[in-house]
Amino acid sequence: MDEVQEEDLDALLAQYRAEWEEKHTSTEEHTNIIPSRRANATLTPCPLGNDLWLYGGEYFDGERCLFYQDLFRYIPEKNEWRSYSSKIQPGPRSAHQMVASPAGGGQLWCFGGEFASTKQTNFHHYRDLWVYSIAERTWEKVETKVRPNARSGHRMAMWKHFIVLFGGFVDTGARTTYLQDLWVFDTYEYKWKEIKQNDLRRPSARSGFSFLSTPEGIVLYGGYCKKYVKGQRTQGLALEDAWFLQMDEDLSKIEWVKRKKIGYAPNPPRSGCTMALWANRNMGVLFGGVTDTEADEESMESTFWNDLYGYQLPGTGRWISLNMRKPKKKKNAEMNVDDDQETEDPATKLPLERYNSMIAVQRNTLYIYGGIYETG
């Protein structure tokens, strides 16, 4: 591919779409297919079962960046992956968002995300909304006159029959613009509505934050943005504030409330961490991330994390550290057990440190897939 083709993303996406439609003429299901390694995908608990749905993402091999548009279902009981494809479905993307609804036999709603040339010299941000019918195994593109601007790195949460979207960023290649607008999509009426906010009482512009739904509203934590100061080098900021979006079916009554930091919050601050909802405990579970510190004026040092934190959602919110425990020894009268023998230390079985991974809690089990760990 020459340089002109490399920069013409519209032509590249049109080529991908034509090749995909030619190859996938009908809805297909494939078994025994494991997703390739990737980051910035979505891992979504099925709203009507025990399964998990993995969609999209990207992989950078050091020279080229590849984007995916495949949809996978993970079945925990069988430890099995299945992939689903159809002629009509969203284009390749990463840093999109997906939420689930139990309506209509189960639905997966996807908005936005990004696609880039293989050398990452040019970027395309999506502003399309798609819904996947789990029962029918089909995608539908939802067309609306009013909709959020194109973006990636935003977050969405499902509250009752509303999809709530906040923030994200747009990267032109020369500069990254971070967003702080709030939108609500009504899945009954198929309409987007922007919620106007008080600039002094809302979260600052950001991407890559956590956004968890509760019966009363939505909790926002952390995220990342860049600080531009004239004459100085751009500075990346890992945010550590928490907010609560008080929801109401009367959308004019929605408002933000800032929360104080209580308990054992992640320290030091980090970006690229992921928080999943543990509904049975009314808690968010946060994993991993990366902390960047300046080694000197020319270089940065990155520390990657694989620790777990819990954020208790009710009330004003409280952080707790989730330490791994050693498994209990099994008692068996017919076995001679050496009391001096140590059970396996759980620290030796922790996932590798990483950021931008995909995590989800389903039936009291935490699942972690993919992410990025840098060396050298």
Stretches with model-predicted labels:
Residues 1-29, 33:
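Sequence/structural signature of beta-propeller modules
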Residues 26-39, 85-94, 143-151, 196-206, ...:
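Short loop/turn motifs that recur once per blade in beta-propeller domains
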Residues 29-67, 94-97, 353:
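Beta-strand-rich domains and repeat architectures in extracellular enzymes and scaffolds
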Residues 39-44, 69-70, 92-99, 128, ...:
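Beta-propeller and closely related beta-sheet repeat lectin domains
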Residues 47-64, 86, 102-122, 142-144, ...:
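Glycine-centered tight turns/hairpins at beta-strand boundaries that repeat
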Residues 67-80, 124-138, 177-191, 232-252, ...:
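Beta-propeller blade signature
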Residues 91, 100-110, 127, 131-172, ...:
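Fungal eukaryote-biased detector of long internal structured cores
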Residues 193, 212, 239-262, 274-287, ...:
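Catalytic lobes of large eukaryotic enzymes
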